[in-house]
């Protein structure tokens, strides 16, 4: 077995898999995304969880999830894989309030589901695998985040998200401050 095969087991059990020390504190941010369609080119339409920023898929930027509004007016969050991009970005709906989520789970993430968004919905997000800020011994790992839909603007075709992305390689803690795990 390779390290990558054993890695999910080690993470699931809370084992120390030799992650580099966390260097980036978790903070809550507000992110406004414009719909992929029917909005001016320029504002971000997608989320890059590896960097914790909005991104612009039309420019070829890396991203994990993109926002759009369909012809019926339904706001949707698309994993990159559903828009012709590779990757393993995944999500799940959380019944736990945003501020009460302390740690991302390791299971029950869905890779290819287009998620309808409504105000107040809380999501757990997992990024694509990336080696950015990971040690050479660990390889590529996902980043984890939690998000809450604060506002949907059908006229302006935007969504406002409350977002906390843990930018440290493989860490799942989702509380403010420097993460332990």
Summary of predicted features, one role per range:
Residues 13-181:
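Surface-exposed, beta-sheet-biased, low-hydrophobicity segments with strongly acidic/polar composition
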Residues 1-12:
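Sec-dependent bacterial lipoprotein signal peptides
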């Amino acid at each position: 077995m390779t390290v990558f095969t054993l890695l999910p087991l080690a993470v699931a059990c809370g084992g120390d898999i030799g992650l580099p020390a966390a260097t980036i504190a978790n903070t809550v941010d507000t992110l406004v995304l414009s719909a992929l369609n029917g909005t001016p080119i320029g504002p971000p339409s997608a989320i890059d969880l590896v960097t914790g920023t909005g991104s612009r898929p039309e420019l070829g930027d890396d991203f994990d999830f993109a926002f759009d509004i369909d012809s019926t007016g339904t706001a949707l969050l698309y994993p990159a894989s559903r828009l012709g991009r590779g990757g393993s970005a995944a999500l799940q709906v959380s019944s736990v309030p945003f501020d009460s989520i302390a740690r991302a789970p390791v299971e029950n993430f869905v890779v290819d589901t287009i998620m309808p968004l409504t105000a107040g919905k809380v999501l757990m997000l997992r990024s694509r695998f990336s080696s950015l800020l990971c040690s050479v011994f660990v390889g590529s790992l996902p980043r984890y985040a939690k998000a809450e839909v604060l506002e949907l603007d059908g006229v302006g075709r935007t969504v406002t998200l409350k977002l906390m992305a843990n930018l440290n390689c493989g860490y799942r803690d989702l509380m403010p401050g420097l993460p332990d795990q």
